A protein has these predicted regions:
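Phosphate-binding site recognition
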Residues: 1-226
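Single conserved hydrophobic/aromatic residue that forms the stacking wall/gate
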Residues: 224-235
Length: 235
């Protein structure tokens, strides 16, 4: 288990241990359905405090092949879905919170350098039996891993859009970031699922062409489904 590669289930376990927990594992059925398809790119845009990070923790706990997390899901809705066993703990997971890297750096170049350096550290430490062409190149490292192991990755990016608030007047920094995401994720066999969370829709940033592979789910009208009040009352 690394800091960013196969981070484990601790975050999701804390959600389950909380005084109030609402079962949102139905999301896993949706992500299972798009694994290794052209629809494997998902971006969820919601306001703060709407459970975006909890959902990312949940997906990490479910897919992470580094541990057996079956006991966490045994009483949740996803346990009774046909795809549950097929994908449980079957993927290497990369999970990053972009706000963390933004807070530790002072420029876009520095942020992207640190992000790639830290991910490469976890990857090369874990996959020690792989011969790497270039350990300074994240994309090539992941290509080499996939070529050797035929194991694809679930990539979870929390707060993907935080830099647009920090660099809202710096179009050059924004372009560098979008170009990096596109190069890292698009048309890569090593991606089984890419799941990003943010506050505002992708289109807010004028980035249709850069990230046009993503299907975006945003909240334009907040409503409860009919079972939700009942679920809340029994939580």
């Amino acid at each position: 288990m690394g800091s960013y590669l196969n981070p484990g289930s601790k975050g999701f376990q804390e959600s389950l241990n909380s005084e109030i927990y609402v079962d949102k594992t139905g999301l896993i059925e949706k992500t299972n359905a798009v694994l290794n398809t052209r629809q494997k790119f998902i971006c969820v845009s919601r306001p703060r405090r709407f459970g975006k990070s909890m959902a990312a923790d949940m997906l990490a706990a479910y897919y992470d092949r580094g541990e057996n997390s079956a006991s966490l899901f045994s009483s949740l809705k996803i346990h009774y879905v046909s795809s549950y066993q097929q994908h449980l703990n079957q993927y290497d997971v990369i999970k990053v919170n972009m706000q963390e890297f933004l807070s530790m750096t002072h420029s876009m170049d520095e942020m992207l350098t640190m992000l790639q350096k830290y991910l490469v550290f976890d990857l090369t430490d874990h996959f020690q039996n792989v011969r790497f062409r270039d350990k300074n190149n994240l994309i090539q490292v992941m290509k080499d891993i996939y070529a050797k192991t035929n194991r694809s990755f679930v990539i979870l990016i929390d707060e993907w859009d935080c830099l647009f608030r920090e660099y809202q007047q710096n179009q050059d920094a924004q372009k560098k970031y979008l170009d990096f995401l596109r190069a890292w994720l698009k048309d890569k066999d090593y991606v089984a699922l890419a799941y990003m969370t943010g506050i505002l829709p992708i289109k807010k940033y004028g980035s249709h062409s850069a990230l046009n592979m993503f299907t975006e789910y945003s909240m334009t009208c907040l409503l409860y489904t009919s079972p939700s009040p009942r679920d809340l009352s029994t939580s």
